[in-house]
């Protein structure tokens, strides 16, 4: 965020092809080096990311997403990428299954915290690299809004759902949703959940010996949850 993406520079067709090329290159490198475990890790990540995106598309259409659904989506579509990167690196360096699983879980917790932080930007200022209320306009129900829909009055819930379904392009209506989420404590709730995943990630790191690598990973977790954009 803050830099031009491949899509911004070359639009959809080129960006999809670049992504396919990089994926194919990574899979081929694993095969050439007979890193079959790494190949399995990467292939599983692609499967999970696809499943996460498909589930999000379905739930955006039906608007019946639960908190459990939300975590299934972000665990698959976002966290699995970082989890697989950590697992692949761990196995390549150690061939230790227990160590690989521990770092995979570290990556997953960090990835979940990253996505919650990203979702919180939708309710903040407009200078973070994505428009405020963009998730609402795209009918994406994220953790702050899911919490609000679960805890608010039936009347307010009906109004919020109506706006998301029918008036999600109207600026004042989107702002009403944002205000209701803030009023209901949805932001605070999401921040607390994010902090719990951050702590889980850092606790896993503490089980490793002190090193520059551990410090760098710790700084990454902190950056993930405290970034401004």
PLM feature spans:
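All-alpha prenyltransferase/terpene-synthase fold signal
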Residues: 1-229
């Amino acid at each position: 965020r803050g830099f031009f993406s491949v899509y911004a520079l070359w639009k959809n067709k080129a960006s999809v092809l670049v992504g396919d090329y990089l994926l194919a290159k990574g899979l081929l490198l694993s095969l050439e080096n007979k890193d079959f475990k790494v190949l399995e890790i990467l292939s599983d990540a692609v499967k999970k990311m696809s499943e996460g995106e498909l589930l999000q598309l379905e739930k955006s259409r039906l608007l019946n997403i639960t908190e459990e659904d939300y975590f299934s989506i972000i665990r698959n579509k976002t966290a699995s990428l970082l989890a697989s990167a950590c697992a692949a690196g761990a196995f390549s360096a150690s061939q230790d299954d227990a160590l690989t699983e521990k770092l995979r879980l570290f990556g997953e917790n960090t990835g979940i915290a990253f996505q919650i932080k990203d979702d919180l930007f939708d309710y903040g200022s407009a200078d973070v690299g994505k428009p405020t209320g963009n998730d609402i306009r795209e009918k994406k129900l994220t953790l702050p809004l899911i919490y609000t829909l679960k805890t608010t009055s039936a009347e307010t819930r009906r109004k919020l759902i109506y706006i998301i379904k029918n008036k999600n392009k109207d600026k004042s209506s989107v702002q009403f949703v944002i205000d209701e989420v803030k009023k209901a404590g949805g932001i605070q709730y999401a921040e607390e959940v994010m902090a719990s995943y951050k702590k889980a990630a850092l606790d896993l790191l503490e089980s490793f010996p002190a090193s520059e690598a551990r410090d760098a990973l710790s700084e990454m977790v902190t950056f993930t949850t405290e970034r401004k954009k």
